[in-house]
Amino acid sequence: MTQCDLFPGVSLMYNDFHMESYDSAFRTTEDLLCIDYCRQGRMEYPAGPDAYSYVEAGDLKLDRRLEHQGHFTFPLAHYHGITVGFALPQAAQSLKEWIREFPVDLARLQNKFCSSRHPKVLHGAPSIDHIFQELYAVPEQIK
């Protein structure tokens, strides 16, 4: 995993996992909104007591990371994807200052797609593919 901090409260992560599974103890007290894009592979994990989540190539997941601990499996023994992470409200303030021409209400997005503890997965979102594919074309020296 390679993480780049773009602005205060905004990070970009390139995820490249080559394994069958791992156990996560991740817990946070931060108010987060994470957007995960799966480029290749598949990842599965429990997303609460009565919920299970998976993402595979072309899927987009919006998540608050409230249920991000437990046993993660990679049925294809690999996963490649990108995560854009927002730590609210710091990220909201940074975006207002750094990207004034692109008004986005992160709290509203979080409320729309992540109103519960469970992630929202959009399976097979081809209209989103090109946006995330462009992030793989970023020159190494600025990653």
Where are these regions (language model features)?
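N-terminal functional module of multi-domain proteins
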Residues: 1-81
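Alpha-helical bundle regulatory/interaction domains
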Residues: 46-143
